[in-house]
Protein backbone atom coordinates (compact mmCIF):
# COMPACT_ATOMS: atom_id res chain seq x y z
CA UNK A 1 0.00 0.00 0.00
CA UNK A 2 1.25 3.48 -0.88
CA UNK A 3 2.80 5.69 1.76
CA UNK A 4 0.45 8.31 3.11
CA UNK A 5 -2.67 6.16 2.82
CA UNK A 6 -4.06 5.24 6.24
CA UNK A 7 -6.79 2.61 6.48
CA UNK A 8 -8.64 1.76 9.67
CA UNK A 9 -11.99 0.29 8.64
CA UNK A 10 -12.23 -3.49 8.21
CA UNK A 11 -13.32 -4.99 4.92
CA UNK A 12 -16.98 -5.98 4.95
CA UNK A 13 -19.23 -7.33 2.21
CA UNK A 14 -22.91 -7.81 1.42
CA UNK A 15 -23.86 -11.48 1.23
CA UNK A 16 -26.76 -13.67 0.21
CA UNK A 17 -27.12 -17.47 0.17
CA UNK A 18 -29.43 -20.25 -1.10
CA UNK A 19 -31.76 -19.57 1.85
CA UNK A 20 -32.29 -15.99 0.56
CA UNK A 21 -30.72 -14.44 3.64
CA UNK A 22 -29.07 -11.04 3.27
CA UNK A 23 -26.41 -9.78 5.65
CA UNK A 24 -23.22 -7.75 6.05
CA UNK A 25 -20.10 -9.54 7.32
CA UNK A 26 -16.31 -9.65 7.08
CA UNK A 27 -14.93 -10.02 3.56
CA UNK A 28 -11.66 -10.70 1.73
CA UNK A 29 -9.13 -9.25 1.39
CA UNK A 30 -8.84 -8.49 5.08
CA UNK A 31 -7.64 -5.10 6.28
CA UNK A 32 -4.30 -6.69 7.21
CA UNK A 33 -3.95 -8.21 3.72
CA UNK A 34 -4.76 -4.86 2.14
CA UNK A 35 -2.14 -3.09 4.25
CA UNK A 36 0.54 -5.70 3.57
CA UNK A 37 -0.36 -6.36 -0.07
CA UNK A 38 -0.07 -10.10 0.58
CA UNK A 39 -3.25 -10.88 -1.36
CA UNK A 40 -2.41 -8.66 -4.37
CA UNK A 41 -1.58 -10.70 -7.49
CA UNK A 42 0.46 -9.58 -10.54
CA UNK A 43 -1.52 -7.22 -12.75
CA UNK A 44 -3.93 -6.30 -9.97
CA UNK A 45 -4.70 -3.15 -8.03
CA UNK A 46 -6.50 -2.71 -4.73
CA UNK A 47 -9.49 -0.40 -4.94
CA UNK A 48 -11.29 1.20 -2.03
CA UNK A 49 -14.89 1.04 -3.23
CA UNK A 50 -16.67 4.35 -2.71
CA UNK A 51 -20.01 3.84 -4.47
CA UNK A 52 -21.93 0.80 -5.72
CA UNK A 53 -25.33 0.70 -7.36
CA UNK A 54 -27.85 -2.05 -6.64
CA UNK A 55 -28.80 -3.80 -9.87
CA UNK A 56 -32.03 -5.70 -10.43
CA UNK A 57 -29.92 -8.84 -10.85
CA UNK A 58 -28.57 -8.37 -7.31
CA UNK A 59 -32.11 -8.31 -5.95
CA UNK A 60 -33.00 -11.32 -8.11
CA UNK A 61 -30.06 -13.38 -6.82
CA UNK A 62 -31.20 -12.51 -3.28
CA UNK A 63 -34.89 -13.27 -3.79
CA UNK A 64 -34.79 -16.09 -6.37
CA UNK A 65 -31.32 -17.53 -5.81
CA UNK A 66 -30.61 -17.77 -9.51
CA UNK A 67 -30.85 -16.20 -12.93
CA UNK A 68 -31.20 -19.00 -15.45
CA UNK A 69 -28.23 -21.36 -15.01
CA UNK A 70 -26.40 -18.93 -12.69
CA UNK A 71 -27.24 -20.31 -9.24
CA UNK A 72 -26.28 -19.15 -5.74
CA UNK A 73 -24.88 -22.27 -4.07
CA UNK A 74 -23.18 -20.80 -0.99
CA UNK A 75 -22.43 -17.54 0.78
CA UNK A 76 -22.15 -15.05 -2.06
CA UNK A 77 -21.15 -11.36 -2.25
CA UNK A 78 -23.36 -9.22 -4.49
CA UNK A 79 -22.72 -6.07 -6.53
CA UNK A 80 -21.10 -5.21 -9.86
CA UNK A 81 -21.71 -1.46 -10.39
CA UNK A 82 -18.81 0.17 -8.56
CA UNK A 83 -16.29 2.99 -8.56
CA UNK A 84 -13.59 3.92 -6.10
CA UNK A 85 -9.99 4.96 -5.60
CA UNK A 86 -6.83 2.92 -6.15
CA UNK A 87 -4.93 2.44 -2.89
CA UNK A 88 -2.28 -0.11 -3.96
CA UNK A 89 -0.84 -1.55 -7.17
CA UNK A 90 1.11 -4.70 -7.94
CA UNK A 91 4.77 -4.03 -8.88
CA UNK A 92 4.14 -4.82 -12.57
CA UNK A 93 1.23 -2.35 -12.94
CA UNK A 94 2.34 0.82 -14.72
CA UNK A 95 -0.99 2.24 -15.93
CA UNK A 96 -2.46 3.11 -12.52
CA UNK A 97 -1.16 4.56 -9.29
CA UNK A 98 -2.53 5.07 -5.78
CA UNK A 99 -4.98 7.95 -5.73
CA UNK A 100 -6.40 7.30 -9.20
CA UNK A 101 -10.20 7.37 -9.30
CA UNK A 102 -11.54 4.43 -11.28
CA UNK A 103 -14.72 2.71 -12.38
CA UNK A 104 -14.53 -1.07 -12.31
CA UNK A 105 -15.56 -3.12 -15.32
CA UNK A 106 -16.67 -6.26 -13.49
CA UNK A 107 -15.35 -9.00 -15.74
CA UNK A 108 -12.17 -11.05 -15.92
CA UNK A 109 -11.72 -12.77 -19.28
CA UNK A 110 -9.43 -15.52 -20.57
CA UNK A 111 -8.01 -13.66 -23.61
CA UNK A 112 -7.73 -17.02 -25.37
CA UNK A 113 -11.15 -17.99 -26.73
CA UNK A 114 -12.62 -16.89 -30.07
CA UNK A 115 -14.90 -14.16 -28.62
CA UNK A 116 -11.98 -12.65 -26.68
CA UNK A 117 -9.63 -12.76 -29.66
CA UNK A 118 -12.20 -11.09 -31.93
CA UNK A 119 -13.02 -8.29 -29.50
CA UNK A 120 -16.40 -9.59 -28.33
CA UNK A 121 -15.17 -10.52 -24.89
CA UNK A 122 -18.66 -10.44 -23.39
CA UNK A 123 -18.97 -13.91 -24.93
CA UNK A 124 -15.81 -15.22 -23.22
CA UNK A 125 -16.26 -18.91 -22.55
CA UNK A 126 -14.39 -18.73 -19.24
CA UNK A 127 -15.38 -15.27 -18.03
CA UNK A 128 -15.46 -14.50 -14.33
CA UNK A 129 -18.16 -11.84 -14.01
CA UNK A 130 -18.19 -10.34 -10.56
CA UNK A 131 -21.40 -10.96 -8.58
CA UNK A 132 -22.43 -13.82 -10.88
CA UNK A 133 -22.17 -17.07 -8.87
CA UNK A 134 -19.73 -18.45 -7.95
CA UNK A 135 -17.67 -15.24 -8.42
CA UNK A 136 -18.06 -12.79 -5.54
CA UNK A 137 -19.11 -9.25 -6.33
CA UNK A 138 -17.99 -5.71 -5.55
CA UNK A 139 -20.20 -4.82 -2.59
CA UNK A 140 -17.18 -4.64 -0.32
CA UNK A 141 -15.02 -1.89 1.13
CA UNK A 142 -11.84 -3.15 -0.57
CA UNK A 143 -11.36 -5.35 -3.61
CA UNK A 144 -8.45 -6.56 -5.73
CA UNK A 145 -9.11 -6.38 -9.47
CA UNK A 146 -7.07 -6.53 -12.70
CA UNK A 147 -5.76 -3.07 -13.54
CA UNK A 148 -6.79 -3.48 -17.17
CA UNK A 149 -10.47 -3.48 -16.10
CA UNK A 150 -10.17 -0.39 -13.90
CA UNK A 151 -11.01 2.67 -16.00
CA UNK A 152 -9.76 6.11 -14.94
CA UNK A 153 -12.60 8.59 -14.38
CA UNK A 154 -10.62 11.68 -13.40
CA UNK A 155 -12.70 14.10 -11.36
CA UNK A 156 -16.00 12.38 -12.17
CA UNK A 157 -18.00 11.62 -9.02
CA UNK A 158 -17.80 8.08 -7.69
CA UNK A 159 -21.57 7.88 -8.03
CA UNK A 160 -21.41 8.68 -11.75
CA UNK A 161 -18.54 6.21 -12.01
CA UNK A 162 -20.74 3.47 -10.58
CA UNK A 163 -23.51 4.38 -13.03
CA UNK A 164 -21.18 3.73 -15.97
CA UNK A 165 -22.06 0.03 -15.68
CA UNK A 166 -25.80 0.36 -16.43
CA UNK A 167 -24.90 3.00 -19.04
CA UNK A 168 -22.65 0.39 -20.66
CA UNK A 169 -25.60 -2.00 -20.84
CA UNK A 170 -27.65 0.62 -22.68
CA UNK A 171 -24.78 1.58 -24.99
CA UNK A 172 -24.21 -2.04 -25.97
CA UNK A 173 -27.88 -2.23 -26.91
CA UNK A 174 -27.71 1.03 -28.84
CA UNK A 175 -24.75 -0.21 -30.87
CA UNK A 176 -26.39 -3.50 -31.82
CA UNK A 177 -29.87 -2.06 -32.36
CA UNK A 178 -28.56 0.62 -34.70
CA UNK A 179 -30.73 3.51 -33.48
CA UNK A 180 -30.37 6.38 -35.96
CA UNK A 181 -31.00 10.13 -35.97
CA UNK A 182 -34.73 10.75 -36.42
CA UNK A 183 -35.84 7.17 -35.70
CA UNK A 184 -39.17 6.74 -33.90
CA UNK A 185 -38.29 4.57 -30.90
CA UNK A 186 -40.19 2.61 -28.26
CA UNK A 187 -38.48 2.04 -24.91
CA UNK A 188 -40.31 -0.72 -23.04
CA UNK A 189 -39.83 -0.48 -19.28
CA UNK A 190 -39.04 2.58 -17.15
CA UNK A 191 -36.76 0.86 -14.66
CA UNK A 192 -33.12 1.91 -14.32
CA UNK A 193 -31.97 0.29 -17.59
CA UNK A 194 -35.01 1.59 -19.45
CA UNK A 195 -34.40 5.11 -18.17
CA UNK A 196 -30.71 5.02 -19.08
CA UNK A 197 -31.71 3.71 -22.51
CA UNK A 198 -34.20 6.58 -22.80
CA UNK A 199 -31.37 9.04 -22.16
CA UNK A 200 -29.27 7.31 -24.81
CA UNK A 201 -31.90 7.23 -27.57
CA UNK A 202 -32.73 10.88 -26.90
CA UNK A 203 -29.02 11.77 -27.12
CA UNK A 204 -28.80 9.80 -30.38
CA UNK A 205 -31.50 11.98 -31.93
CA UNK A 206 -34.40 9.52 -31.92
CA UNK A 207 -37.80 11.19 -32.25
CA UNK A 208 -40.55 10.72 -31.32
CA UNK A 209 -39.92 8.45 -28.34
CA UNK A 210 -42.49 6.59 -26.26
CA UNK A 211 -41.74 4.76 -23.01
CA UNK A 212 -43.97 2.18 -21.32
CA UNK A 213 -44.35 0.77 -17.83
CA UNK A 214 -47.04 -0.62 -15.54
CA UNK A 215 -46.08 1.91 -12.83
CA UNK A 216 -47.44 5.43 -13.29
CA UNK A 217 -44.84 6.80 -10.87
CA UNK A 218 -41.99 5.55 -13.04
CA UNK A 219 -43.61 7.07 -16.11
CA UNK A 220 -43.80 10.42 -14.34
CA UNK A 221 -40.13 10.06 -13.48
CA UNK A 222 -39.34 9.35 -17.14
CA UNK A 223 -41.25 12.48 -18.15
CA UNK A 224 -39.27 14.57 -15.68
CA UNK A 225 -36.04 13.05 -16.98
CA UNK A 226 -36.87 13.60 -20.67
CA UNK A 227 -39.80 16.05 -20.95
CA UNK A 228 -40.45 15.39 -24.64
CA UNK A 229 -40.97 11.64 -24.19
CA UNK A 230 -44.47 10.22 -24.69
CA UNK A 231 -45.65 7.75 -22.05
CA UNK A 232 -47.99 4.77 -22.04
CA UNK A 233 -49.09 2.87 -18.96
CA UNK A 234 -49.34 -0.82 -19.81
CA UNK A 235 -52.75 -2.31 -18.96
CA UNK A 236 -52.24 -5.79 -17.55
CA UNK A 237 -55.78 -6.85 -18.48
CA UNK A 238 -55.24 -6.17 -22.18
CA UNK A 239 -53.63 -8.39 -24.79
CA UNK A 240 -50.20 -7.61 -26.21
CA UNK A 241 -51.83 -6.41 -29.44
CA UNK A 242 -54.25 -4.15 -27.55
CA UNK A 243 -51.41 -2.60 -25.55
CA UNK A 244 -49.54 -2.06 -28.81
CA UNK A 245 -52.51 -0.04 -30.04
CA UNK A 246 -52.23 2.12 -26.92
CA UNK A 247 -48.51 2.58 -27.55
CA UNK A 248 -49.21 3.77 -31.09
CA UNK A 249 -51.87 6.17 -29.80
CA UNK A 250 -49.32 7.65 -27.39
CA UNK A 251 -46.82 8.01 -30.21
CA UNK A 252 -49.36 9.68 -32.50
CA UNK A 253 -51.29 11.99 -30.16
CA UNK A 254 -54.25 9.60 -29.99
CA UNK A 255 -54.29 8.76 -33.71
CA UNK A 256 -52.41 5.49 -33.67
CA UNK A 257 -54.84 3.78 -36.06
CA UNK A 258 -54.57 6.45 -38.75
CA UNK A 259 -53.19 5.28 -42.13
CA UNK A 260 -50.21 7.61 -41.80
CA UNK A 261 -49.55 6.83 -38.12
CA UNK A 262 -45.92 6.62 -37.04
CA UNK A 263 -44.67 3.25 -35.83
CA UNK A 264 -41.36 2.72 -34.03
CA UNK A 265 -38.51 1.63 -36.27
CA UNK A 266 -36.78 0.23 -33.19
CA UNK A 267 -38.18 -1.04 -29.90
CA UNK A 268 -35.67 -1.20 -27.05
CA UNK A 269 -37.23 -3.83 -24.79
CA UNK A 270 -35.80 -3.39 -21.30
CA UNK A 271 -38.01 -5.66 -19.18
CA UNK A 272 -37.60 -9.18 -20.57
CA UNK A 273 -41.29 -9.75 -19.76
CA UNK A 274 -43.02 -11.97 -22.33
CA UNK A 275 -46.08 -9.75 -22.77
CA UNK A 276 -43.89 -6.66 -23.17
CA UNK A 277 -41.75 -8.33 -25.84
CA UNK A 278 -44.94 -9.33 -27.66
CA UNK A 279 -46.35 -5.79 -27.46
CA UNK A 280 -43.11 -4.44 -28.88
CA UNK A 281 -43.39 -6.87 -31.79
CA UNK A 282 -46.94 -5.70 -32.49
CA UNK A 283 -45.84 -2.06 -32.29
CA UNK A 284 -42.89 -1.73 -34.65
CA UNK A 285 -43.12 -0.93 -38.35
CA UNK A 286 -42.67 -3.33 -41.25
CA UNK A 287 -38.96 -4.13 -41.38
CA UNK A 288 -38.47 -2.80 -37.85
CA UNK A 289 -36.46 -4.24 -35.02
CA UNK A 290 -37.26 -5.38 -31.49
CA UNK A 291 -34.08 -5.35 -29.45
CA UNK A 292 -34.32 -7.15 -26.11
CA UNK A 293 -32.00 -5.85 -23.40
CA UNK A 294 -34.09 -7.20 -20.51
CA UNK A 295 -33.51 -10.64 -19.04
CA UNK A 296 -36.58 -12.89 -19.02
CA UNK A 297 -37.56 -16.47 -18.39
CA UNK A 298 -35.84 -19.37 -20.14
CA UNK A 299 -38.64 -19.83 -22.69
CA UNK A 300 -41.36 -17.51 -23.94
CA UNK A 301 -44.01 -17.31 -26.63
CA UNK A 302 -43.81 -14.58 -29.27
CA UNK A 303 -46.12 -13.78 -32.23
CA UNK A 304 -44.02 -15.59 -34.81
CA UNK A 305 -46.20 -14.87 -37.83
CA UNK A 306 -46.12 -11.16 -37.06
CA UNK A 307 -42.33 -11.31 -36.98
CA UNK A 308 -42.29 -13.26 -40.22
CA UNK A 309 -44.85 -11.41 -42.32
CA UNK A 310 -43.65 -7.97 -41.19
CA UNK A 311 -39.95 -8.87 -41.56
CA UNK A 312 -39.26 -7.79 -37.99
CA UNK A 313 -35.82 -8.51 -36.58
CA UNK A 314 -35.76 -9.87 -33.02
CA UNK A 315 -32.34 -9.36 -31.49
CA UNK A 316 -30.69 -9.70 -28.08
CA UNK A 317 -27.59 -8.76 -26.14
CA UNK A 318 -25.46 -10.31 -23.43
CA UNK A 319 -23.81 -7.81 -21.11
CA UNK A 320 -21.43 -5.48 -23.01
CA UNK A 321 -17.96 -5.04 -24.45
CA UNK A 322 -15.79 -2.06 -25.42
CA UNK A 323 -18.32 0.41 -23.99
CA UNK A 324 -16.60 1.91 -20.96
CA UNK A 325 -14.34 4.47 -22.68
CA UNK A 326 -17.35 5.70 -24.65
CA UNK A 327 -19.51 5.83 -21.50
CA UNK A 328 -16.87 7.88 -19.68
CA UNK A 329 -16.69 10.39 -22.55
CA UNK A 330 -20.46 10.75 -22.70
CA UNK A 331 -20.76 11.52 -18.99
CA UNK A 332 -17.65 13.71 -18.76
CA UNK A 333 -18.74 15.85 -21.70
CA UNK A 334 -22.31 16.24 -20.44
CA UNK A 335 -23.97 14.35 -23.29
CA UNK A 336 -25.57 11.93 -20.81
CA UNK A 337 -26.54 13.12 -17.31
CA UNK A 338 -27.13 10.21 -14.94
CA UNK A 339 -27.39 12.12 -11.68
CA UNK A 340 -31.20 12.27 -11.46
CA UNK A 341 -31.43 8.48 -11.53
CA UNK A 342 -30.13 8.17 -7.96
CA UNK A 343 -33.05 8.36 -5.56
CA UNK A 344 -31.61 6.78 -2.39
CA UNK A 345 -28.21 6.41 -0.74
CA UNK A 346 -27.06 4.25 2.18
CA UNK A 347 -23.74 3.55 3.91
CA UNK A 348 -22.25 0.10 3.40
CA UNK A 349 -23.14 -0.89 6.96
CA UNK A 350 -26.84 -0.32 6.13
CA UNK A 351 -26.78 -2.38 2.94
CA UNK A 352 -29.67 -4.61 4.05
CA UNK A 353 -31.91 -1.54 4.35
CA UNK A 354 -30.65 -0.39 0.95
CA UNK A 355 -31.68 -3.69 -0.65
CA UNK A 356 -35.07 -3.62 1.05
CA UNK A 357 -35.60 -0.13 -0.37
CA UNK A 358 -34.52 -1.17 -3.87
CA UNK A 359 -36.78 -4.24 -3.81
CA UNK A 360 -39.92 -2.47 -2.55
CA UNK A 361 -41.89 -0.75 -5.35
CA UNK A 362 -43.66 1.43 -2.77
CA UNK A 363 -40.44 3.33 -2.01
CA UNK A 364 -40.28 4.90 -5.47
CA UNK A 365 -36.64 3.89 -5.73
CA UNK A 366 -35.02 4.12 -9.15
CA UNK A 367 -31.31 3.73 -8.44
CA UNK A 368 -30.10 2.96 -4.93
CA UNK A 369 -26.42 3.62 -4.20
CA UNK A 370 -24.43 2.04 -1.38
CA UNK A 371 -21.55 4.32 -0.39
CA UNK A 372 -18.47 3.85 1.73
CA UNK A 373 -19.31 6.42 4.40
CA UNK A 374 -21.80 8.97 5.64
CA UNK A 375 -19.36 11.66 4.48
CA UNK A 376 -19.58 10.37 0.89
CA UNK A 377 -23.37 10.32 1.15
CA UNK A 378 -23.49 13.92 2.37
CA UNK A 379 -21.16 15.03 -0.42
CA UNK A 380 -23.21 13.24 -3.09
CA UNK A 381 -26.55 14.37 -1.66
CA UNK A 382 -25.42 17.97 -1.80
CA UNK A 383 -24.98 17.60 -5.55
CA UNK A 384 -27.85 15.32 -6.50
CA UNK A 385 -30.42 15.69 -3.74
CA UNK A 386 -31.29 12.02 -3.17
CA UNK A 387 -32.07 10.70 0.30
CA UNK A 388 -31.82 7.53 2.34
Swiss-Prot record:
One of its GO terms (biological process) is L-arabinose catabolic process to xylulose 5-phosphate. Keywords: Arabinose catabolism, Carbohydrate metabolism, Metal-binding, NAD, Nucleotide-binding, Oxidoreductase, Zinc. Optimum pH is 9. Active from pH 7 to pH 11. It catalyses: L-arabinitol + NAD(+) = L-xylulose + NADH + H(+). NAD(+) binds at residues 192-193, 213, 218, 293, 317-319. Zn(2+) 1 binds at residues 55, 80-81, 165. This is L-arabinitol 4-dehydrogenase.
Amino acid sequence: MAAGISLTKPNIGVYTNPNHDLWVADAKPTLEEVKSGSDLKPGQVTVEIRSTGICGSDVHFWHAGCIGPMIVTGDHILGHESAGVVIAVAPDVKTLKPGDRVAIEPNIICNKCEPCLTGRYNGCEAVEFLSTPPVDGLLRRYVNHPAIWCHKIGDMSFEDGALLEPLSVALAGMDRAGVRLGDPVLVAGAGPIGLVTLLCVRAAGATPIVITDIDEGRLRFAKELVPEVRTYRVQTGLSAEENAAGILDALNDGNGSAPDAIRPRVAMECTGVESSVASAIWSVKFGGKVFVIGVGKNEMKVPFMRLSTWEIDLQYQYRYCNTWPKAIRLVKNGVINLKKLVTHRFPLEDAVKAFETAANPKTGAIKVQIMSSEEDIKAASGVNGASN
